[in-house]
Swiss-Prot record:
Gene Ontology cellular-component annotations: cytoplasm
Cofactors required: Fe(2+)
Record organism: Streptococcus pneumoniae (strain P1031)
Record-linked InterPro entries: ATPase_NBD, Gcp-like_dom, KAE1/TsaD, Peptidase_M22_CS, TsaD
Record note on cofactor: Binds 1 Fe(2+) ion per subunit.
Protein name: tRNA N6-adenosine threonylcarbamoyltransferase
Chief location bin: cytoplasm
Length: 336
């Protein structure tokens, strides 16, 4: 059988990435051009800046991905691309490049949900057994997803307000930490003690919903009041207390979901899945099911995860037309 090579594009936010996947599971290349340095001074992602950077580097990323994979344009079998959710301008750059490449070479175009990409990055660790449950935690999303089979996703719980990664970045900004603040807060948390009593919203309620806005507000108020009084708070203890509250919420809801949906596998994915505190809590407390977390290089936004997610769409021949457009608010229940 002839080998299949999928060229995948990811430009949903501030990472320009192009990857090549051979057959179902051999990731030959995963080129990522990060924009973090450009956005640091703004304390967050500026959509217009992100779009311009994507335009500047995407052609070079395509060339590098093909070269690193050791293949030519003529070897590519199909093109996969993130079409949502994300920043509309950023998404359009990747879509335009992917459609142009596919059209020029007469190749099928595979539409991929960005969050499905995070989830299916776990396929890089080992073949996934369905049904499974997934906890998706990133800068823009916090979701519990039931996956009956590859490509069939159902959100069973999600945040009512802030995503967990968003809460980390806002708290980091208050403390004057460099954007993105997640890794630094995680590191500082491991040096401090959980001494501040922050709220754990809805932790005892019998649902699978999350809420982080109250925790974020409590943190900001404590920090602001201390500043007003001229008091000094331990940054390490603040981070430890904040992270402990976040992890208590995530673990409580995940355990409830596992009780409701008796599966054998839990996938934890998204940028926040790189958090050491989360990985430690999962290892210590989730012992009845197999926990699969993608490697660190596949936790953040990258085209490799889009390539993995595209395999099930390829198998279903779920190809898009040239009118495929960006869907910045795309959810699992509104996929093409």
């Amino acid at each position: 059988m002839k080998d299949r090579y999928i060229l995948a594009f990811e430009t949903s936010c501030d990472e320009t990435s192009v990857a090549v996947l051979k057959n179902d599971d051999e990731l030959l290349s995963n080129v990522i051009a990060s924009q973090i340095e450009s956005h640091k001074r703004f304390g967050g992602v500026v959509p217009e800046v992100a779009s311009r950077h994507h335009v500047e580097v995407i052609t070079a990323c395509i060339e590098e991905a093909l070269a690193e994979a050791g293949i030519t344009e003529e070897d590519v079998t199909a093109v996969a691309v993130t079409y949502g959710p994300g920043l509309v301008g950023a998404l359009l750059v990747g879509l335009s490049a992917a459609k142009a490449f596919a059209w020029a070479h007469g190749l099928p175009l595979i539409p991929v949900n960005h969050m499905a990409g995070h989830l299916m990055a776990a396929q890089s660790v080992e073949p996934l057994e369905f049904p499974l449950l997934a906890l998706l935690v990133s800068g823009g999303h916090t979701e519990l997803v039931y996956v009956s089979e590859a490509g069939d996703y159902k959100i069973v719980g999600e945040t009512r307000d802030d995503a967990v990664g968003e809460a980390y970045d806002k708290v980091g900004r208050v403390m004057g930490l460099t954007y993105p603040a997640g890794r630094e807060i995680d590191d500082l948390a491991h040096q401090g003690q959980d001494i501040y009593d922050f709220p754990r919203a809805m932790i005892k309620e019998d649902n699978l919903e999350f809420s982080f806005s109250g925790l974020k507000s409590a943190f900001i108020n404590l920090h602001h009041n201390a500043e007003q009084k001229g008091e000094s708070l331990s940054t390490e203890d603040l981070c430890a207390s904040f992270q402990a509250a976040v992890m208590d919420i995530l673990m409580a809801k995940t355990k409830k979901a596992l009780e409701k949906y008796p599966v054998k596998t839990l996938v934890v994915a998204g940028g926040v899945a790189a958090n050491k505190g989360l990985r430690e809590r999962l290892a210590a407390e989730i012992t009845d099911v197999k926990v699969i977390i993608p490697p660190l290089r596949l936790c953040g936004d990258n085209a490799g995860m889009i390539a993995y997610a595209s395999v099930s769409e390829w198998n279903k021949e779920n190809f898009a037309g040239w009118d495929l457009n960006a869907k910045p608010s795309l959810a699992f229940d509104t996929m093409e």
